[in-house]
């Protein structure tokens, strides 16, 4: 499915199924609305899938991995080589997202869309667009065509997972320097001051943070991304990982799959996807409130509330893996609770 085909495939939620789901929720043995946001989650899943009893047993977290040329400006406390190392470590099973996803009965899908290394690791899907983006302090991160190619990579990966019966997606990433590119993209798309968006990432000093803010400001001045054109923003100050995750969100909406935001980087991709196609928002669920300040600004801009507030800033899809437990609980309660008829109890009626 091409970028244009995906955009044209995104439709509104199935309102009829959502109404039926609400009717069932109101008939479960509990006070009306007493499961709070769990009820909203189930209704959203019903609207996305068109199924009155949605299934979320086949879960995958897609991790897009890429390097960023801006790292040469000293915006990260980690060397660029960490991107390649962690990308390969995902397949060894001992990273944070590995552990958390195992406990939520989810698998990870690792995609190399731009790691600056020749990765020969069984299990890493090679969709390398280029070995890292260009330095945004010297010009655009990528060409417009490369940005679209990265987006289409995300769409492609989601389509293949849909064919395999996956029914719940999480999003994750790995890329040294990607909080810098995310801050740049998000600040342009939202219109916020850079200082409100930028955090310390993987552990910058205060001096490093000040440098990071200046680098982002200068990169935006140099490249002049168009806030009304999300693809232009991704191409000029983004990264291959962000663009590919943007494709994951668009692809999920096109294939009618529920998809979860992880932290700041994937929230930036979700923001870009929604700016491209506003209806995409209906298919997206937030997971946790990242400790990165820009994440809160994105959640506010999208009018979303994270399910979990744990001060995490790991990335990788770790927050999505944790929030899968909430989704499982919501679906289990909805599917397995008895009705008032089962319990021979008079149904609650709304108070006037």
From Swiss-Prot:
<keyword id="KW-0169">Cobalamin biosynthesis</keyword>
<dbReference type="GO" id="GO:0009236">
    <property type="term" value="P:cobalamin biosynthetic process"/>
</dbReference>
<dbReference type="InterPro" id="IPR036087">
    <property type="entry name" value="Nict_dMeBzImd_PRibTrfase_sf"/>
</dbReference>
<dbReference type="InterPro" id="IPR023195">
    <property type="entry name" value="Nict_dMeBzImd_PRibTrfase_N"/>
</dbReference>
<dbReference type="Pfam" id="PF02277">
    <property type="entry name" value="DBI_PRT"/>
</dbReference>
<keyword id="KW-0328">Glycosyltransferase</keyword>
<dbReference type="InterPro" id="IPR003200">
    <property type="entry name" value="Nict_dMeBzImd_PRibTrfase"/>
</dbReference>
<keyword id="KW-0808">Transferase</keyword>
<dbReference type="GO" id="GO:0008939">
    <property type="term" value="F:nicotinate-nucleotide-dimethylbenzimidazole phosphoribosyltransferase activity"/>
</dbReference>
<comment type="function">
    <text>Catalyzes the synthesis of alpha-ribazole-5'-phosphate from nicotinate mononucleotide (NAMN) and 5,6-dimethylbenzimidazole (DMB).</text>
</comment>
<feature type="active site" description="Proton acceptor">
    <location>
        <position position="316"/>
    </location>
</feature>
<comment type="pathway">
    <text>Nucleoside biosynthesis; alpha-ribazole biosynthesis; alpha-ribazole from 5,6-dimethylbenzimidazole: step 1/2.</text>
</comment>
<protein>
    <recommendedName>
        <fullName>Nicotinate-nucleotide--dimethylbenzimidazole phosphoribosyltransferase</fullName>
        <ecNumber>2.4.2.21</ecNumber>
    </recommendedName>
</protein>
<comment type="similarity">
    <text>Belongs to the CobT family.</text>
</comment>
<dbReference type="InterPro" id="IPR017846">
    <property type="entry name" value="Nict_dMeBzImd_PRibTrfase_bact"/>
</dbReference>
């Amino acid at each position: 499915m091409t970028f244009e085909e995906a955009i044209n495939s995104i439709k509104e939620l199935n309102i009829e199924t959502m109404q039926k789901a609400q009717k069932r929720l109101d008939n479960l043995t509990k006070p009306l609305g007493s499961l709070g946001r769990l009820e909203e989650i189930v209704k959203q899943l019903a609207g996305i899938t068109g199924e009155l009893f949605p299934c979320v047993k086949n879960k995958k977290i897609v991790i897009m991995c890429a390097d960023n040329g801006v790292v040469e400006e000293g915006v990260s406390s980690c060397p660029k080589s960490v991107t390649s190392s962690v990308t390969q470590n995902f397949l060894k099973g001992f990273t944070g997202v590995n552990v958390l996803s195992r406990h939520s009965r989810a698998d990870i899908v690792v995609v190399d869309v731009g790691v600056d290394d020749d990765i020969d690791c069984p299990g890493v899907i090679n969709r390398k667009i280029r070995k890292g983006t260009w330095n945004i302090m010297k010009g655009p991160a990528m060409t417009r065509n490369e940005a679209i190619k990265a987006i289409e990579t995300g769409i492609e990966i989601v389509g293949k997972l849909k064919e395999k019966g996956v029914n719940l997606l999480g999003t994750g990433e790995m890329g040294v320097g990607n909080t810098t590119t995310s801050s740049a993209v998000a600040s342009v798309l939202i219109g916020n001051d850079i200082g409100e968006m930028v955090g310390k990432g993987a552990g910058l000093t205060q001096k490093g943070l000040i440098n990071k803010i200046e680098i982002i400001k200068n990169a935006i001045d140099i490249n002049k991304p168009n806030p009304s054109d999300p693809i232009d923003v991704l191409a000029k100050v983004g990264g291959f990982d962000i663009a590919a995750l943007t494709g994951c969100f668009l692809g999920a909406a096109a294939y009618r799959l529920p998809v979860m935001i992880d932290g700041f980087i994937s929230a930036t991709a979700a923001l870009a996807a929604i700016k491209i196609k506003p209806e995409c928002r209906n298919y997206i669920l937030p997971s946790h409130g990242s400790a990165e300040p820009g994440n809160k600004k994105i959640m506010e801009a999208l009018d979303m509330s994270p399910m979990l507030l744990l001060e995490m800033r790991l990335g990788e899809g770790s927050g999505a893996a944790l929030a899968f437990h909430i989704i499982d609980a919501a679906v289990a309660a909805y599917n397995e609770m008895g009705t008032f008829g089962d319990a021979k109890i008079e149904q609650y009626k709304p108070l006037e």
